[in-house]
Amino acid sequence: MSPVDFRLYLVTDRHQTAGRPLVSVLAQAVRAGVRAVQLRERDLPIRELHALVQELQRELPDARLFINDRVDVAVALRTGGVHLRESSLPAGVVRDLLWPSQLLGLSVHSLDGVMAAEQQGADFVVLGPIYDTPSKRVYGPPIGLRILEQAAQKVQLPIFAIGGITATRARAVRQAGAFGVAVLSSILGAENIEQATQDLLSAIEIDS
């Protein structure tokens, strides 16, 4: 099984790119050092999603591409992996469907969720929201650094912190035990995509 060899996990939302083409924004981020992208475009019809994945595989050969929830697309196109929600198919079921080289990520929102993900065989988890952020308010109030610290002490699983992550906050979550960070608007909405990416990468690596 391939290792989790990235610390910055870019999650997509083509509606948050300030009108710029998603593929162009992602290409700039990858050029600046992003090595893992989760394609999270839930409102796209399946054929459009399939075509977009193929385009990204051509345009972003240096990035591991994860598909949110659509295990069928991930398996059919042999992407870098698949990313599940807590309401998705169980991780253990999905694991049996994946190619050996594919990684399995899981989004969780509590300490119990982190521990369950490890037991189910996920390769890594995305935990949050750590800080307040509009895109994550549907999951409830921020859980804060304390839950992150507790989770990092209880599992061996790589934990990516999400929710309101900026370059300054990236240092704090790394110090709290996060393996890495997952971001959307901090990169997608930045005026200078490459600079925003480099700032986050520098912050993440301080305590590596």
Describe every region a protein language model picked out:
Residues 1-91, 96-124, 140, 150-159, ...:
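Conserved N-terminal beta1-alpha1 strand-loop-helix module at the mouth
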Residues 144-147:
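Conserved acetyl-CoA-binding loop-helix of GNAT-fold acetyltransferases
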